[in-house]
């Protein structure tokens, strides 16, 4: 590994400690570029990349949800002037979301997926590709939303095929994929039955093999299993009585694997 690549990794860790996530993204993009000879990222590097983008996108997703909620309230009150201002502001956030998603999707397509050689790294990156297409589908409309949803489905399905063939049901990356795939069915495709079936199957298969779970991934796997169960409880009650509580999804890669 080149010394410049080591330096970028170190700077990314510094940026993470300082909670300067935009700069963390920049440093991790340089790590990917430094490994461009077809060399795969280490597990630590790919987790740092995921944390960087997750924080940068997470802040904007939260902003978008808050602004959209205010917009609905102002519309219901008939405050047209306010609604116009809010729409302009929401568009600014959506431009940032689009730019961030396009940035990581480009890295995934041009470098990361192609260089992945192991089952867990292939699933990790394909899941990531699905996640960022899903984030686009959250706010896009019309044909753009349809395209983002189709890309999400295709990425998650590719990841699922590899996960089912190569990763144990208790593997945290396989569980994290099932968690986010089920959220996609529920939130984007409005298919609560499919969401519940996927989440329940993943949970049941993991429970059946819980005694084989190694100590190193026990904490990560059981955390995601708890999120799967929480969502199942929430969705089942929502199907009987529409709730407003937000879905749980994997927030950080260290909730998925070491």
Swiss-Prot record:
Gene3D superfamilies: 14-3-3 domain. GO terms for cellular component: cytoplasm. GO terms for biological process: protein localization; signal transduction. It comes from Nicotiana tabacum. InterPro entries: 14-3-3, 14-3-3_CS, 14-3-3_dom_sf, 14-3-3_domain. Signal peptide: none annotated. This is 14-3-3-like protein F. Belongs to the 14-3-3 family.
């Amino acid at each position: 590994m080149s010394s410049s690549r080591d330096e970028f990794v170190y700077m990314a860790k510094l940026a993470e400690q300082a909670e300067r996530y935009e700069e963390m993204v920049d440093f991790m993009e340089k790590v990917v570029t430094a490994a461009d000879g077809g060399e795969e990222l280490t597990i630590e590097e790919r987790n740092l990349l995921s944390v960087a983008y997750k924080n940068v996108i997470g802040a904007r997703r939260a902003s978008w949800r808050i602004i959209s909620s205010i917009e609905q309230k102002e519309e219901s009150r008939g405050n047209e002037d306010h609604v116009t201002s809010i729409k302009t502001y929401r568009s600014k956030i959506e431009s940032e979301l689009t730019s961030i998603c396009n940035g990581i999707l480009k890295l995934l397509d041009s470098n990361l997926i192609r260089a992945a050689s192991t089952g867990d790294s292939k699933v990790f990156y394909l899941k990531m590709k699905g996640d960022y297409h899903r984030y686009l589908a959250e706010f896009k409309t019309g044909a753009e939303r349809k395209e983002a949803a189709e890309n999400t489905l295709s990425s998650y399905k590719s990841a699922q095929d590899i996960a089912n063939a190569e990763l144990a049901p208790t593997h945290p990356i396989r569980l994290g994929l099932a968690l986010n795939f089920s959220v996609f069915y529920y939130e984007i495709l409005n298919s609560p039955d499919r969401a519940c079936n996927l989440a329940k199957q993943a949970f049941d298969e993991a429970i059946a093999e819980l005694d084989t779970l190694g100590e190193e991934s026990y904490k990560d796997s059981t955390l995601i299993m708890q999120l799967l169960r929480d969502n199942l409880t929430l969705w089942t009650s929502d199907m009987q009585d529409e709730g407003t509580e937000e879905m749980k999804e994997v927030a950080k890669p260290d909730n998925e694997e070491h």
